[in-house]
């Protein structure tokens, strides 16, 4: 089965640079404590690494 990532926005975007805000929005996160499920690939991993201080990530089997 393909692995997926469960990504939750845990820190606020207030006062964050524009590139971090865009990255979080590109991941599909709009509000605090919102969770999205994304495919586990290099592009998503790169975005998560860029904003790792703002999100929590869990690997799930889907």
Swiss-Prot record:
Family annotation (InterPro entries): Ribo_uL30_ferredoxin-like_sf (IPR036919), Ribosomal_uL30_bac-type (IPR005996), Ribosomal_uL30_CS (IPR018038), Ribosomal_uL30_ferredoxin-like (IPR016082)
Keyword Ribosomal protein part of the UniProt annotation: yes
GO molecular function per UniProt: structural constituent of ribosome
SUPFAM superfamilies for this protein: Ribosomal protein L30p/L7e
A Gene Ontology BP annotation from the UniProt entry: translation
PROSITE patterns according to UniProt: RIBOSOMAL_L30
Pfam family, one: Ribosomal_L30
Gene Ontology CC, one term: cytosolic large ribosomal subunit
Protein's name according to its UniProt entry: Large ribosomal subunit protein uL30
